[in-house]
Amino acid sequence: MDNKKGGLFKIAKKLRNGTKVWARAGYFKCKLLKITTTGAPCLFAGRLKRRYDATFQSMVEIFRQEIANDVTCGRVETALLYFVNKFFRSVGCFGKGKEREVKTDRQRDTGSGEQRIRLERDTETLYQSQLRINQVNGWMSGWMQISLILQ
C-alpha cells in the first residue's frame, strides 16, 4: 500500500494507537473507525474523489442500520464488511475494465469480435473486484477489533 507518503501513513499511525481520527481519504474527510489493536493498516487506501461524498453519506446510513442489527449478536465485523464492500462497489473503486485493443480471430474474419472483447473486459473487472474484496476481508479478519465512532 502506498501509505508512507504523508496522509494515509499518518492516519494508519493514529488508527494503530486507537485514537479517534478524522481520516482523510482522497479529497474528502469523513469520520471513520477506531481500531483498537496494533498493526492495522488504514482501511481506506483508495483515492476517493470529492464527488463520492454524497454516496458515502448514504452508505453510512445503511451501515448504521446494519450495525444496529448485528452489534447485538456481536457481529460487528460482518456489518462493517458489508458496508465496505457495498461502498467500494457503489463508487466504482473496484477497478474499471479497459477496452482491449486486440483483434480476435472472429473479429479478423467476420468483424464480430466485439462481444468477446466485452466479455474479457467484464471478467477482468470482476477479477479485480474479488481481489479488492479479498484484501479488505484479510485486513478485517486479521487484526481488527472495531469500535464504532460513526455517530
Swiss-Prot record:
Gene Ontology BP, a term: meiotic cell cycle
Recorded GO CC terms: cytoplasm
Subcellular localization: Cytoplasm
Entry keywords, A to Z: Cytoplasm, Meiosis
Major site of localization recorded for this protein: cytoplasm
Cytoplasm as UniProt keyword: yes
General function of this protein: Has a role in meiosis.
Annotated protein name in UniProt: Meiotically up-regulated gene 114 protein
Organism annotation: Schizosaccharomyces pombe (strain 972 / ATCC 24843) (Fission yeast)
